[in-house]
């Protein structure tokens, strides 16, 4: 194996990414080297491409970016015992310390010292990526490559949706991006009664309909209260999944929750905004912030969903070769796409 590889690198502190030749990562005794087959583009990668304020203060330059992927193990360190050469794998993109209180209690997703693959250390927009054995996840044979490549965002959706009991509940999802749609699909799969998803982007709303979400609301044209009345809801939503990061959507969600309702919040707002805390208090709402995936309970659940027949393939709207990565980023930046998967 050559000691150089192709990779998408943030080489300059400006808009864009560049295909470069960089050294193949060297592995330590507890590491696994993975040949990447497929990579998917995340919203985080778009922030890095755009070189916005968050990226400017977060990303060291140069940096190989990307964290949504699947591939094949090609080398393991001498202390690795759970994975072998030739194995199909994906990986948890949050590297945790293993030493803090939460890590030692089995709550790795709450680690205060988390490092992000493709953010704080070299990522998976490359021919090879190195991960600690702990972060590598085996992919069953009946899970397609392209689905395994989007397990990172699917995990965000599963973590958010499964934060609260969904059986027989009325669920509102704000934000019909890929994660919001997948969250709505999980809610339906888990036995929610009514699942309503809102957005203002017609392309994403159409995608939600194609993926079987029954009640799709264009918030720029319809009032949520009118939709609730038409579908027979009289007391408000039991569970909210906030995926948009948009102030009007979050405020509308709080207004439409039933007393005692529960809201899981994944959407990241571009700037701070106010909500009516009196409504939160007097309606006795339960608000829970969500970040990443529970390690590794969320991974077990999402593999089970796919093996149980949940078809995520329509959420992938663009399948391209890695040399066409600019087209993939253009699709993501437009807001008029589902997931974009790139083949190495």
UniProtKB/Swiss-Prot annotation:
Has keyword Oxidoreductase? yes
**Gene Ontology molecular-function annotations:** L-threonine 3-dehydrogenase activity; zinc ion binding
Where are the residues marked Important for catalytic activity for the proton relay mechanism but does not participate directly in the coordination of zinc atom as a site?
A: 152
Q: Which residues cross the membrane?
A: none
User: GO CC annotations?
Assistant: cytoplasm
- Where does it reside? Cytoplasm
Where NAD(+) binds, per the record, is at 179, 199, 204, 266-268, 290-291
What is the UniProt remark on how the cofactor binds and its stoichiometry? Binds 2 Zn(2+) ions per subunit.
Tell me which residues bind Zn(2+) 2: 97, 100, 103, 111
Which residues hold Zn(2+) 1? Answer: 42, 67-68
Please list the cofactors this protein needs: Zn(2+)
Query: Might you give the EC number(s) for this enzyme?
Result: 1.1.1.103
Which PANTHER family would you find in this protein's record?
A: L-THREONINE 3-DEHYDROGENASE
HAMAP family named in the record: Thr_dehydrog
> What function does this protein fulfil?
Catalyzes the NAD(+)-dependent oxidation of L-threonine to 2-amino-3-ketobutyrate.
Query: What family does this belong to?
Result: Belongs to the zinc-containing alcohol dehydrogenase family.
Protein name listed in UniProt = L-threonine 3-dehydrogenase
**Source organism:** Rhizobium meliloti (strain 1021)
The gene is: tdh
